[in-house]
């Protein structure tokens, strides 16, 4: 039995590992949509460092010394926008993404009415993960490169 990952706030020193895991995790999405320019793949190390510095919250998941996942959340008014949920490909399907999602929601749940995120409309595994955690598709959009996106939301229980 493997111990659960340690979920903790990211530090500036984590930025390189976050970017490495993020790029590895999003490669399958790039292949699925034939788009090597997805924002998680083109983001720079300086941009990841800026994200870690705030005002958004960035959490990491570690198994021992290895960073195996991360997620970000940014609050705008009464909505918390979840983004860049990434898990190392060899660790996917083990509950790490769900743990990161629950942990990042808990950070801001007392301050917002709902969570919002988007994922590729054809990303069945991602959609299943989010739906298992209470998110529902509320619409569709396209990114600047024409990739079709599913927009999902989840109300915060007993708020608003």
Roles of regions detected by a PLM:
Residues 6-20:
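A short beta-loop-alpha structural element at the N-terminal edge
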Residues 20-49:
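Conserved GNAT-fold acetyl-CoA-binding loop/helix
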Residues 46-60, 81:
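A short helix-loop-beta-strand connector motif used in the catalytic cores of GNAT acetyltransferases and
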Residues 60, 66-74, 81-86:
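Conserved beta-strand in the GNAT
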Residues 62, 85-92, 119-121:
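A short, internal acetyl-CoA/4′-phosphopantetheine-binding micro-motif in the GNAT/acyltransferase core
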Residues 87, 93-106, 128-132:
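Conserved acetyl-CoA-binding loop-helix of GNAT-fold acetyltransferases
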Residues 108-119:
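Conserved GNAT acetyl-CoA-binding A-motif
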Residues 130-141:
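Conserved acetyl-CoA-binding loop of GNAT-fold acetyltransferases
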